[in-house]
Each structure stands twice: as C-alpha cells, then as structure tokens.
UniProtKB/Swiss-Prot annotation:
This is TBC1 domain family member 10A. Its main location: other. The record marks 197 as: Glutamine finger. Residues 505-508 are annotated as: Binding to the PDZ domain of EBP50. Residues 36-46 have a biased composition (Polar residues). InterPro entries: Rab-GAP-TBC_dom, Rab-GAP_TBC_sf, Rab_GAP_TBC_domain.
Length: 508
C-alpha cells in the first residue's frame, strides 16, 4: 500500500478496493473547504476578530460545526463531590485499581470531572507509568530532526484538525506546534509504523487536556495497547475489526445486518473513521468526551458498543430501512446520523446497557482471523495483543509506582536500638545460653558472635517482611564476626512516596 501523501479527498474505500487512500482520506473531513478557508486567517486571526468571538465550554467557536447548543449541566454541588472522589482515587491509584476497579468503571461511566479529565486519562491509559519509565525520552525525540517524508505530511495535516477549536484555529499557533511535536515524536519512537493521518485527531484531543509530553505517552498507549495495528501500513487490524463489528451486529440488530448484507456494503465504508478516530470526528463533543472516559477505562469494547448502537438506531427498524433503498442512501444515512441517537445521555445509556463483552469480541476475533488466514494468508503486520482497558494494562505492565506507605522503610541490624529507644536490645535467652556454653568450653571470655539476621523496621513503626538471610551453618566457624551495617531498602533508595509523587501532578 502506498504511503499517505495527504492530497486525496475524503472518501471511504469501496468493497474490494485497495485501502491505499484510507490513511490520507481521514485527514480531510466533510468540512475540508471551510477548514482551509478558516486556516487562511493564519496566525493573525486574533487581530482579525477571533478574540471577539465567543467560545463554548469545550473551547470551540460558538456557531461553528464543532460547537454545541444547550447542554445538560451537572449541578455544581454534584460536580464538586465527583471531583473530591476522583482526587481521592488519583492520590491512591494503585489501591483503587487493585481493590475497587468496578467503582472506577462506574465513575467513568458517569463522566470524569472536566478539571481532572486529562490527569485521569493519563492514569487510566498507563501513560503516566510510561512517562515515569522513560524520563527525558520525549525531549530526546522532540530535539531530533525527524524523517522528512513524514514531516511534510504531518505539516500539511495540522490545520485540518479541529480548525474551529481555539487551540488549533491559528496556523502556526501553540496548538498546531504541539501537535506537530507529538506526531513527529511518534514517527521517531515507532519508525517502522511511521505516521497515519488518523492519529492526528487522536493526538489533538489529548492535547486539549494535557501538555505535549503527557499527550505523547497517552498516544503511545492508544496505538500499542488499546488499538494495536490500527495505524500500520496495511490497516489489517481495522479490517478485522470491521468484520467483527458486522458479525456482532447480527446479534444486536438483525434488521440492520440484513439490510447491509443485501446492499453489499462493506464495513470499511462506514466504520473506518469511527474506529480509527475513536468517534472524535463523528459525535457531538460532549458525547466524544463521555465515550473517551469509558474507552480509557474499559478498552475497545466501548468503541464496538458505540458503533453497534449507531447502526442499530440508524437502520434497526423496517421503517428506517425503507428510506434507504440503495447503497448511496444507506451510506448517507450513516454519515448524517440523527442528533437524537448521538445525544450524550441517550448514547451513554445505550452503550452501558448493550451486552457486548470482551470475551465475545475476542472469540469473534479468533473466528475472523482464521477466515483471513484461509482466504488471504498470514497477516503481514504483527501487532501486539490488544489489552481491554485500564485494569488489563495495569496487570500487564504495573510500572514502578511507589508503595502506599506513609514513609519509606529502613533496615536495622538486630543489635541496633529501635527507633525511640535508648537501651540496646538484649539477645534472646536461647542465644545467651549458647554463648555461655561456648565461653565455658574455651575457658575464656569472648565477644558474642554478631547476629546473622537483620530486622526490618518501618521508620513510622510499620513492620516490613524480613529479607532472606543464609542459615547460621552456612558461615565458616573460624570466620571473625562482623557487625552488619544498616542497609536501605529499594523503596527507600527510590526516595519516592505517595505524597511526593502526587505533588508533581498539578496539571488538571
């Protein structure tokens, strides 16, 4: 497949047609003409009146295609309560993920508070852990020159990403600069994969909620954990998921499945942009954010559910099917979905209640993969296994998070005084008897041999499990006794605690 050149117009590939135009066609939406017109304002758009335009709560220009009308506002008291609960979860993240993951899932379904959404996405996706594991990596990639063949394509795509949003309205503005940095860094981080233009809207949404470095690592997690293979050259993963979606549709909405089968409409004609852009180009913005909240928590299952809900309500009744007699009418219906079925409260409720599980998706994936191998041979792009949400990512890659303790623990020798005590602790009675017998047998007074076990004591009084020490018989009898020097645990060496770690996390 030819690499993207950023020049083809917006269209979906026909059934059986090559996917060579898919990677570039996603860069241009249906409003490409107005996009270019708006971007022609350049970086002086503020001087030409942009500063006087009203901006909605999401950062879109009021009256533009990205802006929304009246929204269901969450009462301020409820919002503050949710913020308090989320702050507690984020400050004790490992504990909540280990013991109360279901509660996190329920709170993601209710919606993450806007002030904490960016931080929560970093924790849910594992991007926070990746950043800690790779300090300075993004700066290193950012300072590198990059591959010219990708830089030209990325630069041409910058003004097409949410041109009615205040971050990206100005050509060469800070939003477009950060978007360029993130996408260029990814081409250097994964040179074998390069750049797919569907990654641009994903990165842009992340940049609306967090700085460039954090957005980069969240993008890495999406491409490698949530949607592996989606942005590879052959787009094999998205083709497989198209077949999975179509198979699941038969159980969710037989009427819609039968109609699409009769019209011989390939799933790639309607689901490619949905899945590759995670509905960021399809749904109203309030719905996009709610879908992403659940997506980061529960994984690609949410993307499948949203697609199935849209298909079910667009083509799921005989009356709706009668209005779509041909392929063109059907495709137009799916491209111009009713605002009612995309409305935030309605869509989220339908998605939560739809009984489609990870097990069903994985079972269907094996079936479709077997069919692919029988008809087309082996996959050319080997992508890592897909992980279904935050819990699976945490279990697969826990990361070096600090232990949930009030203070670091230290190791003390047995004969050292305990914290807060003045006297040196006496050895056990059994050890005293053995020492007396040895001294009587030798006829001389000797210093008692140093103990061979260390006692681990927490600085705050919390006991930690003792380290393994070789048995007493393993040491040579004629060796001179030596005092054990105090040793510091690995946790103490890291000089990390929950408080110090979270104090660095001030970006909301």
């Amino acid at each position: 497949m030819a690499k993207s050149n950023g020049e083809n117009g917006p269209r979906a590939p026909a059934a059986g047609e090559s996917l060579s135009g898919t990677r570039e066609s996603l860069a241009q939406g249906p409003d490409a003409a107005t996009t270019d017109e708006l971007s022609s304002l350049g970086s002086d758009s503020e001087a030409n009146g942009f500063a006087e335009r009203r901006i909605d709560k999401f950062g879109f220009i009021v009256g533009s295609q990205g802006a929304e009308g009246a929204l269901e506002e969450v009462p301020l008291e409820v919002l503050r309560q949710r913020e308090s609960k989320w702050l507690d979860m984020l400050n004790n993240w490992d504990k909540w993920m280990a013991k109360k993951h279901k509660k996190i899932r329920l709170r993601c379904q209710k919606g993450i508070p806007p002030s904490l959404r960016g931080r929560a996405w970093q924790y849910l996706s594992g991007g926070k852990v990746k950043l800690q594991q790779n300090p300075g990596k993004f700066d290193e990639l950012d300072m590198s020159p990059g591959d010219p063949k990708w830089l030209d394509v990325i630069e041409r795509d910058l003004h097409r990403q949410f041109p009615f949003h205040e971050m990206f309205v100005s050509r060469g503005g800070h939003g477009q600069q950060d978007l360029f940095r993130v996408l260029k860094a990814y081409t250097l981080y994964r040179p074998e994969e390069g750049y797919c233009q569907a990654q641009a809207p994903i990165a842009a949404v992340l940049l609306m909620h967090m700085p460039a470095e954090q957005a980069f690592w969240c993008l890495v997690q999406i491409c490698e954990k949530y949607l592996p293979g989606y942005y590879s050259e052959k787009l094999e993963a998205i083709q497989l998921d198209g077949e999975i979606l179509f198979s699941l549709l038969q159980k969710v909405s037989p009427v819609a499945h039968k109609h699409l089968s009769r019209q011989k409409i390939d799933p790639l004609l309607y689901m490619t942009e949905w899945f590759m852009c995670a509905f960021s180009r399809t749904l109203p913005w309030s719905s996009v954010l709610r879908v992403w909240d659940m997506f980061f928590c529960e994984g690609v299952k949410i993307i499948f559910r949203v697609g199935l809900v849209l298909l079910k309500h667009a083509l799921g009744s005989p009356e709706k099917v009668k209005a779509c007699q041909g392929q063109y009418e059907t495709i137009e219906r799916l491209r111009s979905l009713s605002p009612k079925i995309m409305q935030e409260a309605f869509l989220v409720q339908e998605v939560v209640e739809l009984p489609v599980t990870e097990r069903q998706i994985e079972r269907e994936h094996l079936i479709q993969l077997r069919r692919w191998q029988e008809t087309r041979g082996e996959l050319q792009c080997r992508s890592p296994p897909r992980l279904h949400g935050a819990k699976a990512i945490l279990d697969a890659e826990p990361g070096p998070r600090p232990a949930l303790q009030p203070s670091p623990s230290i190791r003390l020798p047995l004969d050292a005084p305990l914290p807060g005590s003045k006297a040196k602790p006496k050895p056990p009675k059994q050890a005293q008897k053995e020492q007396r017998k040895q001294m009587k047998g030798r006829g001389q007074l000797e210093k008692p041999p140093a103990p061979n076990q260390a006692m681990v004591v927490a600085a705050a009084g919390d006991a930690c499990p003792p380290q393994h020490v070789p048995p007493k018989d393993s040491a040579p009898k004629d060796s001179a006794p030596q005092d054990l020097a105090p040793q510091v645990s690995a946790h103490h060496r890291s000089q990390e605690s929950l408080t110090s770690q979270e104090s660095e996390d001030t970006y909301l």
